[in-house]
Amino acid sequence: MRLRSFAFLGFMLLVAMAPSMASAQPQPLDRIVAVVNKDAIMQSRLEDRVTQVRRQMASRNVPAPNEADLRRQVLDRMILEQIQLQMAERANLSIDDTQLNATVRGIAEDNGMSMDEFADALEEDGMSLASMREQVRREMLLRQVQQSQVASRVNVTDREVERYLDQQGETADTAYHLAHILVSVPESPTPEQVEQAQAKVRDLYRQLQNGANFAQLATAESDGQQALSGGDLGWRRGDQLPSLFADVVPTLSNGEVSEPIRSPSGFHLVKLIDTRGQQGEQKRVVTENRVRHILIGTNPNRNDQQAEALARDIRQRIANGESFAALAQEYSDDDGSALDGGELGWTRPGQMVPAFEDAVKALDVGELSQPVRSRFGYHVIELEDRRRQDVTRDAQREQIRQTLFQRKVSDEMEAWTQEIRSGAYIDNRLEDGRQ
């Protein structure tokens, strides 16, 4: 059974995959292929990653470059990953088992499986549950670093949202399938470095004009985050285009590659793979539920059976007339609502985990649920009120806010990766053949 893609993972997942199986053949003496500040990256790790990336590329029908180019690209991603893991260590960031368990359980639920079924499916895909857990832990840690260092720098104001809402035009109703090549320049580059990058991007552009395969060239030569996916950026609505490309992409024909585009991070080539029309915004009316809950989770002193038993006891006490709010303040493990007596306010579809939402849908106003199991623990839920609400304008604003936020994060991410790379000691022995 093949698992659905773990879409929540960040861009480093492709090269963060653990090897699926250890070779039974005798291994040659391991060597250092790169030193990143105080840490070494060994050749065995690099070869494991290269093997995994080749499998990933084959499954996505992305043409693989030659071995040397692929190893160089994978090592470059491993170096960037190592810098971020070192930043996490210095900042004392960590992922505890409770967070990890909830995330892994959520992945299983998103694939419609129990944990036992999920473990079996992983085995069929050649990966143990233990190795998958460590992969997810590492990726969550990288996301923490990126969140603290990049997303925290980005802010979208209400004025920006309203201005965009007033100004968005026809491009918002068109979706574009894009691919991208980046030829980067260092932070504060010299004129010679800029000239070298410009010469390289011009050469790549000429090759593409002469019929070179964009995906293969991106995999071999791009410094962009999606290089190992053939530079594929996927489908983007017009209002989701990176600000750098927003004026260029609508002028391209399907299959056309833009001329080099200059940015502080380097030179970009963008290919428009395909275009499709989008339906206009439809009126959106949803059912909102005002709910409160008490969450009983597991911890080192309370196993799953004990958590369920406590939740049932609390539910019975409420049914017997005790105060829901008082019991929530005393027992609930949801720090965000416990002090408010478990109040979650008005909730809309998609805001809660599926098990919680399904339970709420089945309740009548004023009714108390039986304990409901989710990835977070056991919930005792009371439906306080229900209403129909037109959220069209709110949905538009939130969509635009997320679009502008992701656009800013994308722009900031390129600058940040250059910044952390420039600030690190990197001895890449693969580049000069010393490995």
From Swiss-Prot:
GO cellular component terms attached to this protein's record: outer membrane-bounded periplasmic space
Entry keyword set: Chaperone, Isomerase, Periplasm, Repeat, Rotamase, Signal
Region forming the signal peptide: 1-24
GO molecular function, one term: peptide binding
Pfam family, one: Rotamase
Keyword check for Chaperone: yes
Catalytic activity: [protein]-peptidylproline (omega=180) = [protein]-peptidylproline (omega=0)
EC id: 5.2.1.8
Localisation: Periplasm
InterPro entries: OMP_Chaperone_SurA, PPIase_dom_sf, PPIase_PpiC, PPIase_PpiC_CS, PPIase_SurA, SurA_N, Trigger_fact/SurA_dom_sf
Domain notes: The PPIase activity resides only in the second parvulin domain. The N-terminal region and the C-terminal tail are necessary and sufficient for the chaperone activity of SurA. The PPIase activity is dispensable for SurA to function as a chaperone. The N-terminal region and the C-terminal tail are also required for porin recognition.
Its biological purpose: Chaperone involved in the correct folding and assembly of outer membrane proteins. Recognizes specific patterns of aromatic residues and the orientation of their side chains, which are found more frequently in integral outer membrane proteins. May act in both early periplasmic and late outer membrane-associated steps of protein maturation.
Record-given protein name: Chaperone SurA
Upper lineage: Bacteria, Pseudomonadati, Pseudomonadota, Gammaproteobacteria, Oceanospirillales
Gene name linked to the record: surA
